[in-house]
Amino acid sequence: MVKHCIDQFCVFGNPINHTQSPYIHSLFSKQTGIVYEYSARLVPFKEFNSYVLNFFLNKGKGANITVPFKENAYVISNNLTIRAKMSRAVNTFKKLHNNKILGDNTDGIGVLHDLKRIKFIKSKFNRVLLIGAGGAARGIIFSLLSYGCSIVVLNRTITRALQLVEDFKNVGSISIFKEKFASNYSFNLIINATTINICQNSNLSTIKSLIHKDVYCYDINYSIKHKYTEFLLWCIKNGAICVSNGIGMLVSQAAHSFYLWYGILPETNSIICKLNRQFYML
């Protein structure tokens, strides 16, 4: 009797007990009919490299990487996709036929996929205010610029925002937010890519006047307890009507990891709806 090896995948992180990835991938497996195993692995902070090496030596086919290891994953990848190079972070590994490890970043394409799904982006000519200039912001800029969005970066530390503009200026239209010209700005979409508590974010008072019923507000963060993050509640309080948390991004970036591994893009809407029902009784 021939024994078939089941493809092995996992997500590396620390902490990892909160991850929804194994559940999401179990739904991808049912949807596509592709049988594979996907587990969550807690990695000690200083042992990421050895854990990854052992996983791929033991027939691992691919993996996802979450905080705080995305930059480590970027460093140890043998090959990188263009979006991983631009992001300087990797959230997806794929083992190639020559046993080399390809590093990719599906965060940006995941955000873009979800924004198109919920119609927060309806054309290629979108004016986006991006709040934050850290790793999360860097991870999504390339895909948005490549699609044709123009981006203005708002960050507490201007030097970090300036660095992002410098790094991505050849990809598309990107600039820093200038407070003295705040009243001159007009945006279709505002994206929060920072985890800073809104009470500690002095930038928000600057953009208060830019929020109204026709501006879409999107937070890449999410909570399994509350549908609306603090940022989204603040947006609603200041006049926003169309808001969304990061559940859709979570599922969509996972779908694009699956696409990298198998060449098939799972349908995401039904899975996002299922998670919303489970988390928020919707």
Curated annotation (Swiss-Prot):
Chain coiled-coil ranges: none
Cellular component terms (Gene Ontology): cytosol
InterPro entries in the record: Aminoacid_DH-like_N_sf, NAD(P)-bd_dom_sf, Shikimate_DH, Shikimate_DH-bd_N, Shikimate_DH_fam, Shikm_DH/Glu-tRNA_Rdtase
Keywords: Amino-acid biosynthesis, Aromatic amino acid biosynthesis, NADP, Oxidoreductase
Residues reported to bind shikimate: T19, Q20, S21, T66, N91, D107
Statement: the UniProt record of this protein carries the keyword Metal-binding: no
CDD domains recorded: NAD_bind_Shikimate_DH
NCBIfam families referenced in this protein's UniProt entry, alphabetically: aroE, PRK00258.1-2
Name listed for the protein in its UniProt record: Shikimate dehydrogenase (NADP(+))
Organism: Buchnera aphidicola subsp. Baizongia pistaciae (strain Bp)
